């Protein structure tokens, strides 16, 4: 094998909107409300190996806006990407799928959610950038805690 064939390789094969749902259970009455809605945002990342070197990464986002406990709108979206990852050490694959790939996908998700909200007749909502490294590290800590080990090696009771 040549050195070129052994070089680390990372390629975006495709980026696509996998799922999009918008609900307005209280329209048109909700448009008469004068109060600003309270907005909640949830983001999650999933990775699935499709082939030996091919991975699908999905960044899911849910945005819920409520005015006095009445839902103004609920948007759920999944932005996905197919990535070809070769000649990368095994211990670096998980962080690549959990940090780098979601960072690439998130601007697409943010744009699709914002577009859906404005097309539904609501003022635009701009989702802040997400630190996927912090999210990834938090997920690792939760997994370690569920497995019964604390970060310093002690067992939690």
Curated annotation (Swiss-Prot):
Could you give one GO CC term from the UniProt record? Answer: cytoplasm
**Primary location recorded for the protein, binned into one broad class:** cytoplasm
The GO terms this record gives for MF are:
unfolded protein binding
The cellular location(s) given in this protein's UniProt record come to: Cytoplasm
| InterPro entries in the record | SecB, SecB-like_sf
Annotated SUPFAM superfamilies? SecB-like
Q: Does the keyword Hydrolase apply?
A: no
Entry's Gene3D superfamilies? SecB-like (3.10.420.10)
Zinc-finger listed as a keyword? no
Q: Which GO terms describe its biological process?
A: protein folding; protein tetramerization; protein transport
Annotated keywords: Chaperone, Cytoplasm, Protein transport, Translocation, Transport
Q: What role does this protein play?
A: One of the proteins required for the normal export of preproteins out of the cell cytoplasm. It is a molecular chaperone that binds to a subset of precursor proteins, maintaining them in a translocation-competent state. It also specifically binds to its receptor SecA.
Entry's family note: Belongs to the SecB family.
Which PANTHER family does the entry link to? PROTEIN-EXPORT PROTEIN SECB, PTHR36918
NCBIfam families on file = PRK05751.1-3, PRK05751.1-5, secB
Subunit structure and binding partners:
Homotetramer, a dimer of dimers. One homotetramer interacts with 1 SecA dimer.
Protein name per its UniProtKB record: Protein-export protein SecB
Source organism per UniProt: Burkholderia thailandensis (strain ATCC 700388 / DSM 13276 / CCUG 48851 / CIP 106301 / E264)
